[in-house]
Swiss-Prot record:
MF term (GO), any: rRNA binding
Keyword annotations of the record: Ribonucleoprotein, Ribosomal protein, RNA-binding, rRNA-binding
Species per Swiss-Prot/TrEMBL record: Anaeromyxobacter dehalogenans (strain 2CP-C)
Protein name as catalogued: Small ribosomal subunit protein uS4
Matches recorded under Gene3D superfamilies: Ribosomal Protein S4 Delta 41, Chain A, domain 1, RNA-binding S4 domain
Family: Belongs to the universal ribosomal protein uS4 family.
Disulfide bridge positions per record: none
Gene name tied to this protein: rpsD
Amino acid sequence: MARYSESVCRLCRRENLKMYLKGDRCYTDKCAIERRPYPPGQHGQGRTKFSEYGVQLREKQKVKRMYGLLEAGFRHAYQNAAAAKGKTGENLLQTLELRLDNVVFRLGFADTRNEARQLVRHGHFKVNGRKVNIPSYLCRPGDKVELKDRSKKVVRITEALEAVDRRGVPAWLDLDKGGFKGTVKTSPAREDITMPIQEQLIVELYSK
């Protein structure tokens, strides 16, 4: 499957937002957006004025990059959100948050969503006792996500868990750090998603 393979630090600079795509580096003064808080490229420090469409597109691109999705996956998530009851924008964010790769990241088993996606694909996790290796698998309230026994000694996982206190675990999740498992207590509410996202702009873009 195609994935963005260039420097993820450029993505944060493009969106002028620290999206924590680089793991521990994002918490240090080595973070690219701290050192160069302007878009990459020859004209990065120039001022750019976006049209209404441009503003909507930038918001969509930002959220796609934040969750590490390509257009097809993101559009599929939007279509599911639009078909569900409630506000489409909030449904979209809830869908993105409940993806298994994001839940693994939020619980602290990985430093980044990209790393969480790889861990899920490589079969390191079980959901309710069954192996699930599909990153887009949607978790539900009550689901238990746990590390397989053979994976409890994987260094990058144990190191990520050691740093979980710095990042924190959202209120809608419960982590049993010593047991290498977590529980989805409830669906995330809008106020649980603290990154600066204007989801209505995405709804307006896809509604055109």
